[in-house]
Every structure is written in C-alpha cells, then in structure tokens.
C-alpha cells in the first residue's frame, strides 16, 4: 500500500497572530482624578468589543467615557470606569482579574462566552441545568413557574427575568436538590418541560405569539441571552409606551446617518444614563451582525451620549429606510428592557428548595407584579432581588411595602429601595444622584455585600 502524505497544520495556527502580537491591558489610576482608565490594545477580531465591555460590566463597573477604534487589524480602546460608589477602581482583585482576562493569558473570547451566567464574584454556579422561558407576562407567572420546580424538588441556583412589551424572558439555572447536580434524567426533564409549558399556555390567550420553554445546553452570558430571546421574539415590533413615572426621565433619541467619507453608518444614541447601557447597545448591534469600527461614549450627569460607526459584517451600510428603522427599534427595545422604576426588594435567606416559590407567592398575594428579577446563591445563602409594581402597573404604595416587611422580615434579611425616576436631563441639568439610577448592582446589593469576605 502506498503511503499518503498530508501537509501538517499546527492546531494553534489560528492563534498565531495573537501569540505574535499578544493583547496589552493597562490600568491607569494616575491620569484622571475621577476615574480609572482601562486601555486595551489587541489584534482585531469579530465580537472583541462586546467581550471587553462584558468583562467590565460583569464587574459592576460604570463606563463613563470610552473611545473605540478597531478599523483595520488592530483594536484600541480606552475606557473611563468607576466602581459602584463612583470612585476609582482600586481593589487589587478586580484589577488583577481585568488584566488576567483581557491580557495575553486571558483568552477572553473562550472564557467569557462559555461562562454559565454573569460573573458572581469568585463564586460559580456549579453543575446545573439551564431553563429558558419566553411568554406573555402576567401577574403571578414567576410564582407559578417556581412552584412547579419546587414540587419537582428542583432548586433554583440562579435566575434572571426581564419584562418588556407585555412579554417576559427568563433564564433559570437549576439543579437536583438531592444531589446538587444537574438534572439529566430524560424522563424527569420531559416532565418538567411539559409542566412548565402547561403553565405558560395559560398566558397566550388572544396572543399571536407562542410561549415556550427550552432546556439550554449552551452557556451564553445571561444578559446577552435575554436580549437574544427578546430579539427572536420580535419584541421590538410592539409600540413601547412608558407609563408616566417612567417617561419623565427615559425617552431615548436614536438617529442613523451616513458617513460618505469613510463609508460608515453612524448611529447616535442620546438618553438617560444608567448602568450597563453600553453593553446593551453593543450586544444588540453585535447580535444583529453589525461591526463597530469606531465609537465615542460619554456621560454628563444623568445624560448619556453614544456614537457608533458601523457596517454590516458583509460590508454594507444602512442604506434603506427600512433597515434604519429596524435598527432604531431594536436599540430602543434593548435600552428599555433593563429599565425598572419604583420599589426594589432585596431578600437574603438560607437557600432551600421552594424559597423562590414562597417569596413570589407572597408578592402575588399582596397584589404585586414582578417587572424584573435576579436570583443568585453565595454558599448557603440565597439573594433575591425583585423590582415590583402593582397588578395594574402602577407604583406600589408604602402600606403594601410595610405589610411585606411585617410578613417576611422576621424570617429573612430584607431591604427596600425606591428608585424615583429622575427628570429629563435637559430639564434638570443636574447629576442624577438623588433619584436616578442607584449605585447598586442588580446582583450585588447591600445584603450580598454583607455575605462576601
């Protein structure tokens, strides 16, 4: 038999450019009095801007300014960031993590795209099964879903739910309470999916969209996955009408223009500033297959201004009015999805099966609807954060809040915060430190901070 010789290809060939020109990350705390400068230089590659922004936002850092340039083969960014209290980033663990993940040994694309959810300090979710739910929103839905899981002796380790345009998207990370391992029995998974779908079918009367439950084997970043679920559900097609409490401070203005000289489409976003705004916009553009070549991000008080120079991945710009309108609607939806006005409720208790079901049941019994929710577990402690409104979508009165405190305050740590919507920046011209967006992470509220070493 004649020998056949094949050319040898080094499996690391694709990473050759990165090894020859490794990424460079520097943390500068001397150039600016008010913030920390994070400078990233690396070989350009698809999705790299989202990867970097994702790392910074997962650490609950606020991006106050940014300058992006990635035209050609090199990617050069400068981010002005502060911590949750508006101070420079001085924590050595945070700085080391940024340098490690974004630096030569970080391989950000590999580690961040496979993380099972947003980073929770040094804590991991462990072995788990991911459940994704998209359905029409209604009062008590989250309570019914969590009750089904509790009856099946399935524990919710972490979860996040958003609502927008009468729809709810939710990602839950669960495990078997008896083994603390992922639920992998086919019959049990089938039963769980069937029972959840039965709950969701009750939401879809007189609605042209379908509810669905899926068991995810992927591990996309949870915030990005929620954006993707809403985008696939075409939530941007519905007309968004904010209520009076929300509209007084949050109406984004988005324009799309053409840059003849360089052949870019230029997107300008002007809106009220809030945490993770840049992530939501960059995430949406990336998932719509647009590449950001240049960008300038700035914020002043409660106002944010962001400018992006983009092309589609096929090299085309936004030439038709239909394309421009679609991008504007999708960005508006991405901005609105994370908006939550009114009372936030933070609860901390020993983790157990049925805890989420119990808390959401109590909220429902008090006539409250959950507009946004986050659940995480630190050791044996579960931390739940809920943004609530009454069943009609109106702000919750103080009497209801006090009744909640009296009913559940004896069995778990509880903290209420009222996020008063700030006035439009052009009317106030002041920083939104009094009302506006609280300097509190969605997952890292005061209660969780007490648990961390």
Curated annotation (Swiss-Prot):
GO terms for MF: amino acid binding
Is-annotated flag, keyword Translocase?
no
Classification via Gene3D superfamilies: 3.30.70.260
Tissue specificity comment: Expressed in roots, cotyledons, rosette and cauline leaves, sepals, style, and pedicels and tips of young developing siliques.
Q: What induces it?
A: Down-regulated by abscisic acid (ABA).
Q: Which domain of life, per UniProt?
A: Eukaryota
Q: Where is the ACT domain?
A: 37-112, 130-212, 266-341, 344-423
Q: Which UniProt keywords apply?
A: Repeat
InterPro entries to which the protein is assigned, alphabetical: ACR1-12 (IPR040217), ACT-like_dom_sf (IPR045865), ACT_dom (IPR002912)
Q: Does Isomerase appear among the keywords?
A: no
Output a single Gene Ontology CC term carried by this record.
cytosol
Q: What does this protein do?
A: May bind amino acids.
What is the name attached to this protein's record?
ACT domain-containing protein ACR3
Q: What is the lineage of its organism?
A: Eukaryota, Viridiplantae, Streptophyta, Embryophyta, Tracheophyta
Q: Which gene encodes it?
A: ACR3
């Amino acid at each position: 038999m004649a020998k056949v010789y094949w050319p040898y290809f080094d499996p690391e060939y694709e990473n050759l450019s990165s090894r020859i020109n490794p990424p460079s990350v520097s943390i500068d705390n001397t150039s600016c009095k008010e913030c920390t400068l994070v400078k990233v230089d690396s070989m350009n590659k698809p999705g790299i801007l989202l990867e970097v922004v994702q790392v910074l936002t997962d650490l609950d850092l606020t991006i106050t300014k940014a300058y992006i340039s990635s035209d050609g083969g090199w990617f050069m960014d400068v981010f002005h960031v502060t911590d949750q209290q508006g101070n420079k980033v001085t924590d050595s663990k945070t700085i080391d993590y940024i340098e490690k993940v974004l630096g030569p040994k970080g391989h950000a694309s590999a580690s961040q795209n496979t993380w099972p959810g947003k980073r929770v300090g040094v804590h991991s979710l462990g072995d788990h099964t991911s459940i994704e739910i998209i359905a029409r929103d209604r009062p008590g839905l989250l309570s019914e879903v969590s009750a089904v899981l509790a009856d099946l002796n399935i524990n919710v380790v972490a979860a996040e739910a958003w609502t927008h345009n009468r729809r709810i998207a939710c990602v839950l990370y669960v495990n078997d309470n008896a083994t603390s391992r992922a639920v992998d029995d086919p019959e049990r998974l089938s039963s769980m999916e069937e029972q959840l779908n039965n709950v969701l079918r009750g939401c879809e009367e007189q609605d042209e969209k379908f509810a669905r439950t899926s068991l995810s084997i992927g591990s996309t970043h949870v915030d990005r996955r929620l954006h993707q679920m809403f985008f696939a559900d075409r939530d941007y097609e519905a007309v968004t009408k904010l209520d009076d409490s929300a509209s007084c401070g949050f109406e984004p203005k988005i324009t799309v223009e053409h840059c003849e000289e360089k052949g870019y489409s230029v997107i300008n976003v002007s809106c009220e500033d809030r945490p993770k705004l840049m992530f939501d916009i960059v995430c949406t553009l990336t998932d719509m297959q647009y590449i950001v070549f240049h960008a300038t991000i700035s914020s002043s008080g409660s106002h944010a201004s962001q400018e992006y120079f983009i092309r589609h991945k096929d090299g085309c710009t936004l030439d038709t009015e239909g394309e421009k309108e679609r991008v504007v609607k999708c960005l508006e939806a991405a901005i609105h999805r994370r908006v939550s006005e009114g009372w936030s409720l933070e609860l901390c208790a020993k983790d157990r099966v049925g805890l989420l079901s119990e808390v959401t049941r109590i909220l429902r019994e008090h006539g409250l609807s959950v507009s946004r929710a986050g659940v995480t577990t630190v050791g044996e402690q579960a931390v739940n954060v809920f943004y609530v409104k009454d069943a009609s979508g109106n702000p919750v009165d103080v009497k209801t809040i006090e009744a909640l405190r009296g009913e559940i305050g004896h069995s778990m740590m509880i903290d209420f915060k009222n996020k008063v919507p700030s006035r439009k920046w052009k009317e106030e011209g002041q920083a939104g430190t009094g009302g506006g967006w609280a300097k509190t992470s969605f997952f890292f509220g005061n209660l969780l901070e007490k648990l961390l070493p």
